[in-house]
Regions:
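Auxiliary, metal-adjacent structural segments of Zn-dependent hydrolase domains
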Residues: 16-99, 120, 140-148
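Alpha-helix boundary/N-cap detector
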Residues: 37-44, 151, 155-158, 212
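Exposed alpha-helical structural elements
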Residues: 41-48, 52, 124, 134, ...
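A conserved beta-strand element that flanks and buttresses the S-adenosyl-L-methionine
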Residues: 102
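Catalytic Zn2+-binding segment of zinc metalloproteases
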Residues: 105-125
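Pan-zinc metallopeptidase signature
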Residues: 156-227
Length: 227
């Protein structure tokens, strides 16, 4: 191996062994357990975030942690926001998935600090409830029934979640909700409706489709990014 190749190899190895990164040279991104997929370049993901999302939206985020966490295993999820920080599983499919996970959890952080700005005028709430009503109509027309009261609940409800993903099934739900929600996960609760929309806003190349499908949500997120 020549000297140039050796230097490049050593630099790449050092990057892979690095356990501390920063977003906007300010927010620590700490690696508790190395990302299992060696093809994922965390620096690329963080750079993309810095290029696409306004820095001020991260002002209330304390840190990002990547690794194996009991909280993730208990909920059977890849990411979670809690106590001012984002926790991510080190088992990531690819850079796109990691990017979206960080954005999604950032949205939950924003909910915590801008709840009145996001939900105060109830426009998103009204839009979400109307979509839930459309969902009920479609599912019942396909002979899929549950307690009607569940469609009106804004918070996450385990019974409704089990109905959607076990009784209806994710694949079928995705097919039936194409013209209602940006993704099936957005139907689970108001908070996920917002976070899923925020994720799409900064990763989807079809803003016109988003704006047409969820106009109130699109406008709210757009306004939030301009504060």
């Amino acid at each position: 191996m020549g000297s140039i190749e050796y230097i490049k190899s050593s630099a790449n190895k050092a990057k892979k062994n690095n356990r501390e990164y920063y977003l906007f040279n300010d927010i620590p991104v700490m690696i508790k357990d190395f990302i299992s997929n060696d093809e994922i370049n965390l620096s690329n993901v963080l750079k993309r975030i810095e290029q696409n999302i306004p820095k001020n939206l991260f002002s209330n985020l304390d840190a990002v942690y990547i690794g194996k966490f009991p909280e993730l295993d208990a909920k059977n999820v890849e990411s979670v926001y809690m106590n001012g920080a984002i926790y991510l599983s080190n088992n990531q499919i690819d850079e796109e998935n990691l990017y979206k996970s960080i954005i999604h959890e950032l949205a939950h952080n924003l909910e915590e600090y801008f709840q009145e700005d996001i939900y105060g005028d109830e426009k998103i709430i009204s839009e979400f409830i109307n979509k839930r009503k459309s969902l009920r109509s479609i599912l019942e027309s396909n002979k899929l029934f549950c307690n009607p009261v569940l469609y009106l609940k804004l918070e996450f409800d385990e019974e409704f979640d089990n109905f959607l993903y076990k009784t209806v099934g994710y694949d079928k739900l995705a097919l039936l909700t194409t013209n209602i929600f940006l993704s099936p996960y957005a139907a689970t609760s108001l908070r996920e409706y917002f976070s899923n929309g925020f994720e799409h806003y900064f990763s989807d190349i079809r803003p016109e489709y988003f704006n047409k499908l969820c106009p109130k949500l699109y406008f709210k997120i757009s306004s939030l990014t301009k504060q």
